[in-house]
Structure formats: C-alpha cells, structure tokens
Amino acid sequence: MTDAKNVLVTELTGFANPMIARRLAAAGARVIGCDPSISEDGAHDGVEVVGWAKPADVVDRAASQFGGKLDAIIISSAMPAPRIRVEDLTEENLMPYFERLAAGSLLFAGAAVRTMRPNKSGRIVFGSSSGPIGGIPGFSAYASSRAAINGVVRTLALEVAGDGISVNAVAANFIQTETYYPRALLEDPVKGPKLLARVPMGRLGEAEEVAALVELLALGQSGFVSGQVIPISGAWC
C-alpha cells in the first residue's frame, strides 16, 4: 500500500499503461494520465487526465492538480515497430522514434525533476525495451531510440541521486499487448509457435507483470534502487 502517492502516467492508452495506471490506483496512489489522443482535461476509463501538450506543460498541470507534489512519473512511450532494414533507413522513418521514444521521454523526465527537486524525493520510471540488449535484426530504428533511454538512466540517476530521486527503466519484450505482440499474432497457427519458440519461458508476458514491476519501482520499498535497466522478457536477455 502507499501513503496517497501522486503519480503521473504518460501515454495512458498505449502498451501496458492502462494496466499500470489501474494497478497503481488500486495500490492507493492518486493517478493522473496523459496521452497524445487526449486533448482536454477530464477522465479516461476512470483515470483522471490532463490534455496532451509539451512535456513541461503536462507535468506542471498535473503537479498543480496534485497540490504541487509529484511523487512519481511513469514515462512509457510506445509506438509500432515495423521491420526496417538499416540500408532502408531515412530521416523520415528514423527520426520519429527518437523524437517520441527518446527526446520526448527525456523532456518528461526533466520536467519531473524540476517539480521533484524542491521536495527532495521522487521516482522516475521509464518504460523501455530489452530489444537493444538482446538484439533483434531489422529493428535498428526502434532499438537505437530505446537504447538512448537505457543509456541515459545511469547518468540521470547520478545527476539526481543527491535530491532523493531514483531513476530506473523497465526494459520489456515479449509482452502480450496490442502495440507489439497482439493476440492475433499469438493465435496464428504458424507465427504463434515460432514467436513462443524465441522466448525461453515459452510464453508471452502479461501487462499485469509489467505493472507489478512498475509498482515496485514507483511505490514500493525500492527507493535505494536507482540507475538500473531491468529486463522483463522471460529470460530472453
């Protein structure tokens, strides 16, 4: 259980984020979400939301609704990752990954730090990928943007450690969500078995399992854990 912690969850409708928001709320946190598809303040599927804007504006408005104290932020951007050979990369099909998954995530982190520093406490949890760790041929655009976040976790953790802020990343892969591994793929009689054969545990992970790890890092007794990129991929990496 939590002591009424205030948590902002970005990109509320993507990947495992709906489950993350529900689990944090069930643990006693006050959760506010934001998403590119939501332009107005209000509510979405029972979760309080602020309309999408620049990261600094979103964080400031959420913090204001929290009464000035942001305890944790879950920065979990997600976008489809089609297979693109490296020789076919162009600025047009490469840069959107960096703008959304890397630059956008880091800007949210910076805005959160500005809010958390005066309180000398806070937790930043990035939603990232273990793809850059294990390596998947044909996904260099996606992997490079995720690797940027994985690579900055340690640096950012050292930068804010003295202010009582922890920084970690949940590096997921082989999680059954409609964003990356939709149920239709799993149920395909040819592609499904091939997919599961790549996972040492022989199954896909569930959004609830990602949410459980996020809860531990955002709300649990894990405040001394920082600077870590934690794979959740069924022993794939």
Model-flagged regions — what are they?
Residues 215, 226-237:
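Short C-terminal tail/terminal secondary-structure segment
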Residues 87-107, 121, 125, 149, ...:
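Catalytic Tyr-X3-Lys loop
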Residues 2-32:
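Canonical Rossmann dinucleotide-binding motif of NAD(H)/NADP(H)-dependent dehydrogenases/reductases
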Residues 79, 97, 123-148, 153-162, ...:
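Catalytic loop of short-chain dehydrogenase/reductase
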